[in-house]
């Protein structure tokens, strides 16, 4: 058995090279079929994301990592000398540990990010669909998913916001007890606001207002998250309805001023409002923070929160790494015990084959009228000689080669030193 991982990722390779060896859906189907039909690879899974391409496999006896690397280079028509400097290789327990670290987000560009686990699960499902994975590799991935779940349960590695969009939503959850009962106004409709909307939706927010310069872009978000749409000039009219305002536009001048917020507060009878301004330059006048019942956070405030949370994730990662080390060692113990089970089964089958062969000869001898006592004595002698032949030769060879430790193991194995 030889477990192997070969791959490149965001730390070892440039974007250009990662793009060259990425597997599109069509390429993945062809690649998995090639792995399945390979004479050198027993079982394999291909993980391909924007940040990494990795092949997890069990190779047959005598096959080295070079075979898999050559296959990857040839498949993508990439020169081997271009690929090799960026390749990393993990074998046996190191391969097991690497997969577990990847799935737990410990090897990600953003430490602890949860999306990678879904990508690993998809890679495994694809390999299964094409009958490319079985045996040890299949068991490895199943164990890996349990380890990732344990890490998420026993540590808080994914619990601290490390993106601006998620940090903004985390602030909202901290200040307002229930987002399901809060109205959120999103100013802008770009990628960051779309991420904010997704996080808010996941957190249970049901009342969203999207304010944007162009209605068409705002409608895309509105359809996706069941939101109301207004134009930027309509913000003063609707601002009082919002408990939380998160803004990210490309406007060169502030969109929301102190006077506008004062008016909204009066209409709300001074119920608190949270403003999160993640635009550069600012969408919300800094003087808004001077008002009572207003919480105003800028992108710099969020950055300090994110920096703190990254440090917290690093602390949580220490415990996660300990879990991965423990679980990878446990998986290797399972592999060794599996190998022992196979050896025991083969030993029993060989012994049973000898027994049946000699028994049949004895039955034939008895049927031909030979003396029963003589037949039984011959059976017992031959059975004893055949069963002790292999360990006898092994002890003689160990003694001849000056291998006392090996001789001691054999003696213990056959019960001489128990």
Swiss-Prot record:
Positions with a binding annotation for substrate: 49-52, 108, 113-115, 119
Keyword list, A-Z: NADP, Oxidoreductase, Porphyrin biosynthesis
Signal peptide region: none
Pfam name, any one: GlutR_dimer
A Gene Ontology biological process term: protoporphyrinogen IX biosynthetic process from glutamate
Site (Important for activity): 98
Domain of life according to the entry: Bacteria
Gene Ontology MF: a single term: glutamyl-tRNA reductase activity
Oxidoreductase found in the keyword field: yes
InterPro entries in the cross-refs: 4pyrrol_synth_GluRdtase, 4pyrrol_synth_GluRdtase_dimer, 4pyrrol_synth_GluRdtase_N, GluRdtase_CS, GluRdtase_dimer_dom_sf, GluRdtase_N_sf, NAD(P)-bd_dom_sf, Shikm_DH/Glu-tRNA_Rdtase
Catalytic activity reported: (S)-4-amino-5-oxopentanoate + tRNA(Glu) + NADP(+) = L-glutamyl-tRNA(Glu) + NADPH + H(+)
Catalytic residues of the enzyme: 50 (nucleophile)
Pathway: Porphyrin-containing compound metabolism; protoporphyrin-IX biosynthesis; 5-aminolevulinate from L-glutamyl-tRNA(Glu): step 1/2
Residues annotated for NADP(+) binding in this entry: 188-193
EC number: 1.2.1.70
Function: Catalyzes the NADPH-dependent reduction of glutamyl-tRNA(Glu) to glutamate 1-semialdehyde (GSA).
Entry text on domains: Possesses an unusual extended V-shaped dimeric structure with each monomer consisting of three distinct domains arranged along a curved 'spinal' alpha-helix. The N-terminal catalytic domain specifically recognizes the glutamate moiety of the substrate. The second domain is the NADPH-binding domain, and the third C-terminal domain is responsible for dimerization.
Similarity section: Belongs to the glutamyl-tRNA reductase family.
Subunit structure: Homodimer.
Misc note: During catalysis, the active site Cys acts as a nucleophile attacking the alpha-carbonyl group of tRNA-bound glutamate with the formation of a thioester intermediate between enzyme and glutamate, and the concomitant release of tRNA(Glu). The thioester intermediate is finally reduced by direct hydride transfer from NADPH, to form the product GSA.
Protein name: Glutamyl-tRNA reductase
Lineage, highest ranks first: Bacteria, Pseudomonadati, Pseudomonadota, Gammaproteobacteria, Vibrionales
Gene (UniProt): hemA
